[in-house]
């Protein structure tokens, strides 16, 4: 399975010498907050028409310092809770089996596996490794091992089809793929692969541990170098490979830790005033349950942040509500990271009520906004659990707005305030006017978390990121006078099904390729549990016979399960603008009107 001949023995640098230690003071002016009236709770600067984060910032290493996100994360463990330092606090736990990996063991496994990747497979900085597997402990170790030697991690959904993998391979051009056994046959034949959990995979780490291979040399990666290629759907109907840098991930870790410290400081201040402290989402023994897949930006980013903070990640292979409730009870989970459908399900679950969930103090919600009504219903059922809404994109490496502390968590309907070092604008899409608090427009963001760009697609990159670094989110939003961000609607046409992005154009292309179908359009249909369902409006060819089930089946065999069409309506024509653009809003209103008549 050797990719290249083993390299000559390198000159070794002890791993400890790579570690970044945070002695660097952070200049507050670098946050871009100049001109902001600090008495303004919105963070809006009238002179620049820009919203600035008013949160405290943590140390961030100089951008010119060579540093991988793995080395940065491990460097922070020296300040981790005492249980971690003593080797008793697990880094990872398998939710199903209870197998736990301590922090010393995790760091050792990463280094041993990195040695096998370097010496046996000949992987080098800049190579791309496709990783296709359900979430598991091996995948978490593999991510860090790859990034520690400068190899670009490219996680993909194990539920994707052969056609979808072929497209992703064309984008990322992987040197090798690490795959789950059930996925291997769906990859293009020319891609070299190692099956995760196989004897070959296990030998990569075990041979290093036995001294068979030397440790890899210290890799002097520039922080703006690509660390990961994450896949994001575009409205064109084809996924794009989003280039996330080491700097992006390091900045997210820094922001996460700064917010944790702020919450802890405010709780200590309240305690000094005699106020009863609220439960902390990040106590010394913080344990986070990962029902979201590690290939998703939420799971991928949260893993790096959890490890760097010395917290425990409880990994689920796939989400199941009953299993999640059991895991919370068994492992005393303090924090649950989830998409809105999970919140809805918890409020209705008898299983959740039967379990002891008293350890849970926060549920971190992302992927789509959580409605005020659902938030209030959840608070009624679980009054001691904070809802921590966050907002972000794959293109922003995860959250650019979030909630911190009980006061912010009570702002139902909002997705929180800007994260440290993030700037934002609200832009009128019709006039280009930059708007102030209370005005609705497209959200633009800027900061060290913004992606490098779309791989192999300079036109899409230029259309998404302005020359001065502003990322156009495609979401209709506004800030209120207190700096809370509200997501009103999606300017992008993506359908958000259980936190996944479903591009309607991709489904329309499949439908329109059928000879029995004259025209078709796919729109989001509101659903309390899933968020949105893909609904197809279909125009049959004259004389053609086609049932709703046949329409759903013809799409299902070409796409991953989360992209399936869930509702179908037959119509005489698809409403379009003079330019031929589908008028999706008319179809959504038509769907809602027909439902209300039932």
From Swiss-Prot:
(E)-4-coumaroyl-AMP binds at residues 367, 389, 394, 492, 496. Belongs to the ATP-dependent AMP-binding enzyme family. SUPFAM superfamilies: Acetyl-CoA synthetase-like. Carboxylate--CoA ligase that may use 4-coumarate as substrate. Follows a two-step reaction mechanism, wherein the carboxylate substrate first undergoes adenylation by ATP, followed by a thioesterification in the presence of CoA to yield the final CoA thioester. It comes from Oryza sativa subsp. japonica (Rice). The gene is 4CLL6. Residues 390-454 are annotated as: SBD2. The lineage of its organism: Eukaryota, Viridiplantae, Streptophyta, Embryophyta, Tracheophyta. It is an enzyme of class 6 (ligase). Residues 320-389 are annotated as: SBD1. Both substrate-binding domains (SBD1 and SBD2) are involved in the substrate recognition, and are sufficient to confer the substrate specificity. The keyword Nucleotide-binding applies. This is 4-coumarate--CoA ligase-like 6. Pfam families: AMP-binding (PF00501), AMP-binding_C (PF13193). GO terms for biological process: phenylpropanoid metabolic process. Its EC number is 6.2.1.12. The keyword Transmembrane does not apply. Its cofactor is Mg(2+). InterPro entries: AMP-bd_C (IPR025110), AMP-bd_C_sf (IPR045851), AMP-binding_CS (IPR020845), AMP-dep_synth/lig_dom (IPR000873), ANL_N_sf (IPR042099).
